[in-house]
């Protein structure tokens, strides 16, 4: 399981701890990842995703998983999220046509 957000692509970064004496030691900055279950209204199913706390706030701000996925850039999404985005878009176009 990678340490990257499935919705925003946030991943591990590296940098330095810098002491008061300006000594630098390498460190890793880990994203704040949460295992959450999000509901898709269009598909009527819940999905388990590993997302950052920031992405979780963005999902709620945009009005749910479906709205977030439709507005998100595909290159930031994980493979699973891209597939989910495609399914949601297909389902919504079917509903608007009917």
From Swiss-Prot:
One Pfam family in the UniProt entry: Ribosomal_L28
Family the entry assigns: Belongs to the bacterial ribosomal protein bL28 family.
A molecular function GO annotation: structural constituent of ribosome
Any one GO BP annotation for this protein: translation
The entry's keywords: Ribonucleoprotein, Ribosomal protein
Lineage: Bacteria, Pseudomonadati, Pseudomonadota, Alphaproteobacteria, Hyphomicrobiales
Keyword Magnesium assigned: no
GO cellular component: cytosolic large ribosomal subunit
Protein name (database record): Large ribosomal subunit protein bL28
């Amino acid at each position: 399981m990678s340490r990257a957000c499935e919705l925003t692509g946030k991943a591990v970064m590296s940098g330095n701890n810098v002491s008061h004496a300006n000594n630098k030691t390498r460190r890793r900055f880990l994203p704040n990842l949460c295992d959450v279950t999000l509901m898709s209204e269009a598909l009527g199913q819940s999905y388990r995703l590993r997302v950052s706390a920031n992405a979780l706030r963005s999902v709620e701000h945009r009005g749910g998983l479906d709205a977030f996925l439709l507005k998100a850039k595909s290159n930031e999404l994980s493979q699973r999220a891209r597939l989910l985005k495609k399914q949601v878009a297909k389902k919504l176009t079917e509903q608007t046509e009917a």
